[in-house]
Amino acid sequence: MKLAYWMYAGPAHIGTLRVASSFKNVHSIMHAPLGDDYFNVMRSMLERERDFTPVTTSVVDRQVLARGSDEKVIRNIVRKDGEEQPDLIVVTPTCTSSILQEDLHHFVRQAQLSSRCDVLLADVNHYRVNELQAAERTLHQIVEFYINKARKSGELSGPPRRTERPSCNILGISSLGFHHAHDLRELKKLLQDLGIELNLVIPQGASVHNLKHLGRAWFNVVPYRELGPMTARYLQEQFGTPYVEITPMGVVETARFIRQIQQVLNEQGIPVDYEPYIQEQTLYVSQAAWFSRSIDCQNLTGKKAVVFGDCTHAAAITKILAREMGVHVVWAGSYCTYDGEWFQAEVGGYCDQVLLTEDHTRVADAIAQVEPAAIFGTQMERHVGKRLRIPCGVISAPMHVQDFPIGYRPFLGYEGANQIVDLIYNSFTLGMEDHLLEVFGGHDTKEVIHKSLSADSDLIWTREAQAELNKVPGFVRGKVKRNTEKFARERGLTEITLEVMYAAKEALGA
């Protein structure tokens, strides 16, 4: 645990609640003080669903601190079992209530005796894992619980019978995921085009009673690194089900994804050939491949960009920028530091540097130092971009309500490739656009742009020098300012005058 002004990944209980609330007819009891109970409001605001968020807070108050929680937690579980009649109740503490060190396992066992539904305590260490790791662990725990339950009851004896036609499960589509609902729709369309049936999607919209049928699929699809791989490995161990974990984001990676599905099916005796489909989609249906060869896209060649987000999206966008659009990625980074080795291996050949950090101030300073033409990041990088007047495209969680679009905006598959190309192209300020906006009064440009976030400049600009700097076109002003300040520091100057500006310009040959 650490005290932070702002976090990229939330606390562990948010991950558990995201997974539990994604299932149909599953209720969650959150054992927490007031202040930790913001999940309901957050999900209701962002997901725009018509149903209430199925989460109840068992409040840790003064009475609980004096008498203990057992009576209150058990009473809330039994009450919700009677009122909501769920198939499963998931009990989770928060990092705050975990400090009490109460035996919640005992509370759950006691409540199970008086409840019709199943009751499960989320097996998560709230001090050591974040939202994404907890979501991964909770999904695996629920799947394992119901498969073991089916085996004990005799519903699942021996290897499960596969579906007649090739089918797959999609693992990892969840509530509050970045464009997950749109990605699911696009994945369904892609799989349908390939002649593959859909067995189950988990956790989004799935019933826990159907989890015993997961083994009937021919293979599993894991589109995101952050949620699903642990469950996919478990299903492979239990049923021998192979899994495809290539993220079909961008034209090249979508083709790799389809080819891996082809390989999996060929190994199981199904002689499919998807190359004609890949060719048709790439050359004639998807606009992304055509656009990447157009004169418009050539305007982006060599432009500088930075990328930051979760491992899945940051790695995919870095590859698309560098490989498909010719953009120079100065650095790519991720806040999933626990998966840093994989990220480094994925993006190492497509960018100059790799940044692995959970500290948003380090990310902001790295952006300010590089002064890219565009940023591709999270909600926080959008804020940084606004302060630095650098355009930003949001490509990863955490995100705000405007990144839960009502229209169809997938990131996966061929339509996702089109959407990403639009996002990338529209994020750059092209040609003389910025200068023309200034000439015709597009924005207020009286203030000099400062390209430092953590600390103010130690140099003083005279009024005349500042006025001269304001005359420089906006799209190069930051570079001129930075070079002038560097020139002054190298010579031990503390004040920048017109003479210093001209000397710096002459020294740099600009």
Curated annotation (Swiss-Prot):
InterPro entries given in the database record: ChlB/BchB/BchZ, LI-POR_suB-like_C, Nase/OxRdtase_comp1, P-CP_red_C, Protochl_reductB, Protochlorophyllide_Rdtase
Gene3D superfamilies assigned: 1.20.89.20, Nitrogenase molybdenum iron protein domain, Proto-chlorophyllide reductase 57 kD subunit B
TM segment ranges: none
Residue ranges that the Swiss-Prot or TrEMBL entry lists as coiled coil: none
Matches recorded under CDD domains: Pchlide_reductase_B (cd01981)
Positions bound to substrate: 431-432
Molecular functions (GO terms): 4 iron, 4 sulfur cluster binding; ATP binding; metal ion binding; oxidoreductase activity, acting on iron-sulfur proteins as donors; oxidoreductase activity, acting on the CH-CH group of donors, iron-sulfur protein as acceptor
Pathway(s) where this gene product acts: Porphyrin-containing compound metabolism; chlorophyll biosynthesis (light-independent)
Cofactor field: [4Fe-4S] cluster
Keywords of this entry: 4Fe-4S, ATP-binding, Chlorophyll biosynthesis, Iron, Iron-sulfur, Metal-binding, Nucleotide-binding, Oxidoreductase, Photosynthesis
GO biological process, one term: light-independent chlorophyll biosynthetic process
UniProt keyword Lipid metabolism present: no
Binding site for [4Fe-4S] cluster: 36
Catalysed transformations (reactions): chlorophyllide a + oxidized 2[4Fe-4S]-[ferredoxin] + 2 ADP + 2 phosphate = protochlorophyllide a + reduced 2[4Fe-4S]-[ferredoxin] + 2 ATP + 2 H2O
Name the record gives this protein: Light-independent protochlorophyllide reductase subunit B
Lineage: Bacteria, Bacillati, Cyanobacteriota, Cyanophyceae, Synechococcales
Originating gene: chlB
